[in-house]
C-alpha cells in the first residue's frame, strides 16, 4: 500500500522516487510502482540525484556515502538540495504518505506502473549482464530474492524491474555473509513461495552452513554463487 500512495504522489506532483541503498525489502516487478535504488558509487549517486532541489525523507535518514572516500562528498545530494523529513525512521511513514496524498488531493490519481519487460535470453560468455538477463528470464511470479551478489550483481535491478511481481531483500550493513541465512529465513517464513539466493563467493564462504539447513528443512531455495574467485568488493574499494 505504501508504494501505491507514493506512486500517487509521484504522478500528482511530478516528483521522483528513490529508495535508500540499504533498504531491507522492496516490492518490485511488472504492475507495481518502480522505485530506483540509491546507487552505491558516490559519483553515480550524485548523478542520479543532481536534479533534485528538495528531498523529502520518509522512514529513512539523509543519504550519505557508505565510506568516507578521499576527495568525495559524504552527502549523496547536491549541496543546494533542501532536505525535509515527512516521517522519521521511528514514525508512521505509511500513514504519513496517505495523509499527504489526501491533503494534496492525490487519492484518485492514476499511478504509473512498471510495464512487463524481459531482456532477451542471452547466450555465450557469462558476465554480469548475461547472468542478470538469465535471472530476469527465469524469475517466477511471487519469488523472494535474497541479493548478496555484491560486485557481480550491480546490474540486476535494471534487468529485473519488468519481471513478474516479486520481493527483493537487500543486505543492510557493511558486513557480508547475510544473504544465504536471509534466504533460509525467507523460505521458512513463506513456504509457499520460491526463494532465489544470489551470493558472491566471498560472501558465501562465511555462512555455507545455510545450505545444510535448507536441505535439512527441505526449503524451496535455489542458490546461485557468483564465483569470480577474487573477493572483488575489496579490490573495488581499494581502487
What label would you give each PLM region?
Residues 54, 144, 194-196:
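Structural motif
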Residues 2-23, 140-143, 156, 229:
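Redox- and metal-dependent alpha/beta enzyme cores, enriched for Fe-S-associated oxidoreductases
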Residues 112-190:
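Active-site diphosphate/adenylate-binding microenvironment
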Residues 20, 57-59, 87, 148, ...:
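Short beta-strand segments
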Residues 12, 33, 155-239:
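Thiamine diphosphate
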Residues 2-8, 134, 210-213:
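A short acidic, amphipathic alpha-helical/loop segment
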Residues 4-5, 17-119, 238:
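Glycine-rich, acidic loop regions that bind phosphate or pyrophosphate groups
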Amino acid at each position: 500500500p505504501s508504494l501505491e500512495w507514493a506512486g500517487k504522489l509521484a504522478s500528482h506532483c511530478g516528483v521522483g522516487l528513490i529508495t535508500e541503498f540499504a533498504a531491507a525489502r522492496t516490492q518490485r516487478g511488472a504492475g507495481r510502482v518502480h522505485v530506483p535504488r540509491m546507487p552505491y558509487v558516490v559519483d553515480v549517486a550524485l548523478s542520479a540525484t543532481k536534479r533534485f532541489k528538495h528531498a523529502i525523507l520518509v522512514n529513512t535518514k539523509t543519504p550519505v556515502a557508505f565510506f568516507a572516500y578521499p576527495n568525495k562528498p559524504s552527502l549523496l545530494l547536491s549541496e543546494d538540495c533542501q532536505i525535509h523529513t515527512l516521517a522519521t525512521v521511528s514514525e508512521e511513514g505509511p500513514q504519513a504518505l496517505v495523509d499527504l496524498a489526501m491533503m494534496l488531493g492525490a487519492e484518485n490519481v492514476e499511478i504509473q506502473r512498471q510495464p512487463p519487460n524481459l531482456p532477451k535470453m542471452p547466450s555465450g560468455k557469462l558476465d554480469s549482464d548475461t547472468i542478470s538477463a538469465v535471472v530476469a528470464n527465469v524469475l517466477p511470479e511471487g519469488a523472494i530474492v535474497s541479493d548478496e551478489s555484491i560486485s557481480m550483481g550491480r546490474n540486476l535491478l535494471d534487468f529485473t524491474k519488468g519481471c513478474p511481481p516479486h520481493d527483493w531483500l537487500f543486505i543492510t550493513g557493511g558486513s557480508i555473509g547475510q544473504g544465504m541465512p536471509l534466504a533460509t529465513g525467507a523460505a521458512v517464513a513463506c513456504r509457499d513461495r520460491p526463494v532465489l539466493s544470489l551470493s558472491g563467493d566471498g560472501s558465501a564462504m562465511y555462512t555455507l552452513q545455510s545450505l545444510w539447513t535448507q536441505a535439512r528443512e527441505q526449503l524451496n531455495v535455489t542458490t546461485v554463487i557468483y564465483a569470480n574467485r577474487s573477493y572483488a568488493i575489496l579490490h573495488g574499494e581499494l581502487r
